[in-house]
């Protein structure tokens, strides 16, 4: 095998990558949590070129993300964490849209308004599927690399390492049929 797909994060991810590095095991690690707080710092150099993440966002995606990253870092200059969960921005913006559309905070009206709701995000359009309430957004595959390498403008956790985009999957390309039979209130 040349790759390991793992759900490990935190200390478990760090120990896994470091142990494979020490053992000379030449594999890449694909994870959803590779950029989660503490993971890049604890893995360190052992993750360069080998730690890959599949996420909805990372600091070096470009497009409209630079403004968000710069704003976050200027507001929290002493923080070693990073803007990671862009889905929180989407959720809040779409909630505001639903409230404004209905001029109400009634949960049922808001839920109905959010079904099929769209938001023009800083890195592309996102929307909520009506049939199962999934948020659909672009997905990125990225690899941990050294700050300053092509495509790595921002480091994570001020480590001198950041994620470089390997590929982007458009939201529409992630849509699969669903068997969801959601019961909705009247």
Language model feature labels by segment:
Residues 17-91, 99-105, 155-185:
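Extracellular/periplasmic periplasmic-binding protein-like sensory domains
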Residues 3-23:
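Hydrophobic alpha-helical
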Residues 6-10, 32-35, 54-58, 132, ...:
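Active-site-proximal beta-strand/loop segments in catalytic clefts of secreted hydrolases
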Residues 106-123:
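Short, well-structured alpha-helical segments that form the helix of a local strand-helix-strand
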Residues 1-2, 27:
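Local beta-strand N-terminus motif with an aromatic residue
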């Amino acid at each position: 095998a040349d790759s390991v797909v793992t759900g490990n994060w935190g200390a478990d991810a760090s120990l896994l990558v470091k142990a494979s590095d020490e053992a000379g095991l030449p594999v890449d690690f694909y994870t959803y949590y590779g950029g989660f707080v503490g993971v890049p710092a604890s893995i360190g150099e052992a993750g360069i070129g080998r730690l890959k993440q599949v996420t909805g966002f990372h600091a070096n995606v470009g497009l409209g993300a630079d403004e968000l990253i710069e704003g976050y870092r200027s507001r929290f200059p002493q923080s070693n964490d990073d803007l990671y969960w862009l889905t929180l921005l989407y959720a809040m913006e779409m909630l505001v849209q639903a409230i404004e559309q209905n001029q109400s905070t009634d949960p049922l009206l808001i839920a109905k308004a959010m079904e099929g709701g769209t938001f023009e995000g800083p890195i592309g359009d996102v929307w909520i599927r009506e049939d199962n309430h999934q948020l659909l957004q672009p997905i990125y595959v990225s690899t941990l690399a050294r700050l300053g390498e092509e495509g790595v403008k921002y480091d994570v956790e001020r480590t001198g390492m950041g994620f470089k985009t390997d590929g982007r999957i458009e939201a529409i390309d992630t849509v699969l049929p669903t068997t969801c039979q959601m019961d909705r209130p009247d």
